[in-house]
A protein has these predicted regions:
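Perimembrane helix-loop-helix junctions
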Residues: 185-217, 244-245, 271-281, 364-376
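Transmembrane-helix motifs of polytopic, lipid-linked glycan transferases
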Residues: 94-117
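Short periplasmic/luminal acceptor-recognition loop of GT-C membrane glycosyltransferases, typified by
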Residues: 400-482, 502-516, 545-546, 550
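Membrane-interface alpha helices of multi-pass inner-membrane proteins
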Residues: 153-156, 165-192, 215, 337-348
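Multi-pass, polyprenyl lipid-linked donor-dependent membrane glycosyltransferases
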Residues: 95-99, 122, 134-154, 178, ...
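Extracytoplasmic catalytic/substrate-binding loops of multi-pass membrane glycan-assembly enzymes
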Residues: 37-52, 65-80, 87, 227-230, ...
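Membrane-interface transmembrane helices that cradle and orient dolichyl/undecaprenyl
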Residues: 152-167, 273-276, 320-331
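Aromatic/acidic, Gly/Pro-rich catalytic loop(s) in extracytoplasmic/lumenal soluble domains
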Residues: 502-557
């Protein structure tokens, strides 16, 4: 009877804790969005995923009607953004914020080794701090890496449990449909499952796991093949510039703080000696010092978007994981998975750093440093909570300051005085600087003055297609060199076809949209845009900061 009462009480406590974690996560999503969700906009890559989702909504076939150097899992996921009863750009940023917080919770689940319903108070606060670190100064926009990390974290958690292993491998396989750089995730998942499987069944389990992980990719290929897009899919994927992780390794070797890593190694070696003594307070002090080094590394550059802090974290957390495996005499698969995810995140053309999982790296290091250690104070639980709250407070202060002063390709919050609702209702309450506002106002005026059923805005401005409900006649919404890959000829063929059909407006930037908010009006260069201009024979005119090529309805060439 006593055992039954205790079980009922424990289940009730777990439900309360689980509800507390959910409530805390929702509050954190709301807080992050309130701080950063409506600040800044730049008409380059912000909205690029939404533009591809918009194409799918209008019946276009990926890799056939539009170009993508990666599978289009992210545009499919973010069809959700269009279904929410909110202005599109607000919905997009809210979904992204929720994804980032959910990823932090899942990585916390993996690293702590217990479900959120069984977390102690200080662990929940630490996970909240890790979420802010991982979000750092990254723009709150739909992006492949954010979707991929969420699926990878979900998969790693689910493969820990026999009942959800299949679902876990489906999630890990789906990450490859989002971005092929997550190829290592299913292999790590297989290693996790194989490690807990009896030797006699290991081969069969491995093959079965790989087959489940292959299901999302196989379905993707089957569907696009049914529409005749397989040859172009292969061309676009293989034509993309490969990434081997060299950037991260180079950054760790050239910008990694060797002195900091050396300090970590010395402290860890000293910790081995200190722990050999019974009830040694030195172990607590050394662990506190190591924790300060790890957290200090994360905050040293104020969570800025660009910086070497994430590379340094990857380096020292890798050292901590190796030390922990040596101490425990067993392979730390969750630790390897998180460090490996940091490497996969760094496989990027434009953002080759592990910062989007930096908070998970910090949490991993802290949990492993304190693993098995009992603090020699009576109210140790209270001390742990107070320390965690202090770290969260410091992290939140740095986060808020950075998000208001170092806004992605825009100006500080005090200078964001232009409400983008003037451009389109789907911008909601987002604000930008007056120069970007004037740039977008001129663009909208040009579109109004020269009506056409097909409008292209080159080489940037991807968000404007779904926001202004425009049909882009070219197969790529953002003419960035790495997105183009080997599809130069295909884009020019589409431009020639557009010219023959007529009824189009193509606006060419005479200023680079990426630098408008920072230095005012500047000439930009885009070689492919110049080539497109050369094959269009519509009427050329100057319209605000754009060169317009216009072929009115009924004026086919």
């Amino acid at each position: 009877m006593t055992t039954m009462i205790r079980d009922v009480r424990d289940r009730r406590e777990e439900r309360l804790r689980g509800g507390g974690v959910i409530a805390g996560a929702l509050v954190l999503v709301g807080g992050v969005f309130a701080v950063a969700g409506r600040l800044g906009f730049n008409p380059t890559d912000d909205g690029y995923i939404l533009a591809q989702s918009y194409r799918i909504l209008h019946g276009e076939v990926p890799h056939l009607d539009f170009i993508s150097p990666r599978p289009v899992g992210s545009p499919i996921i973010h069809l959700l953004d269009f279904a929410l009863p909110l202005p599109l750009m607000i919905a997009s940023r809210l979904v992204t914020t929720a994804e980032l917080v959910a990823t932090a919770v899942l990585i916390g689940w993996l690293v702590i080794g217990r479900s959120p319903a069984r977390w102690r108070a200080w662990e929940g606060v630490a996970v909240a701090a890790s979420a802010l670190i991982s979000i750092h100064g990254f723009p709150l926009m739909d992006w492949h890496t954010i979707d991929g990390v969420l699926l990878v974290a979900l998969g790693f958690v689910l493969v820990q449990y026999p009942r959800t292993t299949v679902t876990g491998f489906l999630a890990l396989g789906a990450a490859l449909v989002v971005k092929q750089s997550f190829f290592l995730a299913p292999l790590l998942g297989v290693a996790m499952v194989a490690a807990r499987t009896a030797p006699a069944a290991r081969l069969a389990t491995t093959l079965r796991s790989l087959l489940w992980a292959a299901v999302p990719g196989a379905l993707y290929v089957l569907v696009i093949s049914a529409f005749g897009a397989f040859p172009s899919f292969v061309r676009e994927i293989t034509g993309a510039r490969p990434i081997y992780g060299r950037d991260l390794m180079n950054e760790m070797l050239t910008h990694g703080d060797l002195a900091r890593s050396a300090v970590v190694v010395v402290l860890l070696v000293a910790l081995v000696a200190a722990d050999s003594r019974p009830r040694s307070w030195i172990g607590t002090v050394l662990r506190g010092a190591l924790t300060a080094v790890v957290v200090g590394t994360a905050l040293q550059q104020h969570l800025q978007l660009y910086g070497t802090w994430g590379d340094q974290l990857e380096e020292i957390v890798g050292i901590v994981v190796l030390w922990h495996m040596y101490r425990r005499r067993r392979v730390d698969w969750p630790g390897i998975a998180v460090v490996g995810t940091g490497w996969m995140v760094s496989l990027s053309w434009g953002y080759a750093v592990p910062n989007l999982v930096a908070g998970g790296l910090v949490l991993l290091a802290v949990i492993r440093i304190w693993d098995g250690h009992q603090v020699a104070t009576r109210p140790s639980a209270l001390v742990s909570v107070l320390v965690a709250v202090a770290v969260f407070g410091a992290t939140a202060a740095v986060f808020v300051h950075t998000r208001r002063t170092d806004i992605y390709r825009d100006r500080p919050a005090s200078q964001l005085t232009f409400p983008l609702s003037r451009i389109a209702p789907d911008f909601g309450s987002i604000r930008t600087n007056p120069d970007t506002g004037a740039y977008l106002s001129d663009m909208k005026a040009c579109i109004r003055q020269m009506p056409a059923s097909k409008v292209a805005l080159l080489p940037n401005n991807a968000a404007l297609y779904p926001v202004l409900h425009l049909h882009d006649p070219l197969p790529l919404d953002w003419l960035w060199i790495d997105e183009i890959g080997g599809s130069h000829a295909q884009i020019l063929d589409a431009a020639r076809s557009l010219d023959r059909q007529g009824d189009y407006l193509v606006l060419f930037e005479t200023q680079d949209a990426s630098v408008v908010p920072m230095v005012g009006l500047q000439p930009g260069s885009a070689p492919l845009a110049s080539d497109i201009l050369g094959v269009l024979h519509g009427r050329q005119t100057r319209c605000g900061p754009f060169v317009a090529v216009y072929s009115p309805p009924g004026a086919a060439h």
